[in-house]
Amino acid sequence: AASAGGGARSADDIIAKHCNACHGAGVLGAPKIGDTAAWKERADHQGGLDGILAKAISGINAMPPKGTCADCSDDELREAIQKMSGL
């Protein structure tokens, strides 16, 4: 899913490099990749996908801002969240 500029990373690349360490195993309460019910519960409490994205950008609990992907765009983070969550 490259942007018009061709520089965007794929959601899979971002997940593998920045998200999988915690979301792959559910470390420290992180919702696991593919556990749509866990992600939906969070979405319901945080204002949907936009709410989850906002928390991902600012950081939440043990998760640092942008989940260690400081140079990820909001769109890249949204795509990674959608891919991990199934939402």
From Swiss-Prot:
The protein's name in its UniProt record: Cytochrome c5
Superkingdom field: Bacteria
UniProt function note: It is unreactive with cytochrome c reductase or oxidase but seems to function as an intermediate in nitrate respiration of facultative anaerobic pseudmonads.
Keyword set includes Nucleus: no
Family: Belongs to the cytochrome c family.
Disulfide bridge partners, by residue number: C69-C72
Ligand binding (heme): C19, C22, H23, M63
This protein's UniProt keywords: Disulfide bond, Electron transport, Heme, Iron, Metal-binding, Transport
SUPFAM superfamilies from the UniProt entry: Cytochrome c
Pfam families, per database record: Cytochrome_CBB3
Modification after translation: Binds 1 heme group per subunit.
One function term, GO molecular function aspect: electron transfer activity
Assembly with partners or alone: Homodimer.
Species of the source: Ectopseudomonas mendocina (Pseudomonas mendocina)
InterPro entries, alphabetized: Cyt_c-like_dom (IPR009056), Cyt_c-like_dom_sf (IPR036909), Cyt_CIE (IPR002323)
